[in-house]
C-alpha cells in the first residue's frame, strides 16, 4: 500500500511540474509574440527590412538554442 501511495504522489508531482513548465513556456511564447508585434509595428513605420531580418534570425537562433539546451 505504501508503494502505491509513493507512486501516486510521484505521478501527481511530475504532472504538476510538467503543467508548471507548460505554463511558463506559454507565457514566454506570448511575450515573444508581443515583442514581434511591436517590432512589426515599428517596421511598418519605416525602420526598414534589415531589422526585420535580424529579428527573424535572432528569434530562430533563440528557438534553436532553447531546443539544444532543453530550456
UniProtKB/Swiss-Prot annotation:
Annotated organism of origin: Sphaenorhynchus lacteus
Main location: secreted
Protein name, UniProt field: Frenatin 2.3S
Residue ranges of the region described as Disordered: 21-56
Post-translational changes noted in the entry: Frenatin 2.3S is not amidated.
Segments of skewed composition (Basic and acidic residues): 44-55
Cellular component, GO annotation: extracellular region
Keyword Metal-binding attached: no
Protein origin, superkingdom: Eukaryota
GO terms for biological process, alphabetical: defense response to bacterium; innate immune response; regulation of defense response to virus
InterPro entries, sorted: Frog_antimicrobial_propeptide
Subcellular location: Secreted
Amino acid at each position: 500500500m505504501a508503494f502505491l501511495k509513493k507512486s501516486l504522489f510521484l505521478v501527481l508531482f511530475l504532472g504538476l511540474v510538467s503543467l508548471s513548465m507548460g505554463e511558463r513556456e506559454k507565457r514566454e511564447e506570448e511575450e515573444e509574440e508581443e515583442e514581434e508585434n511591436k517590432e512589426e509595428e515599428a517596421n511598418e513605420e519605416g525602420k526598414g527590412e534589415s531589422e526585420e531580418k535580424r529579428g527573424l534570425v535572432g528569434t530562430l537562433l533563440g528557438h534553436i538554442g532553447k531546443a539544444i539546451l532543453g530550456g
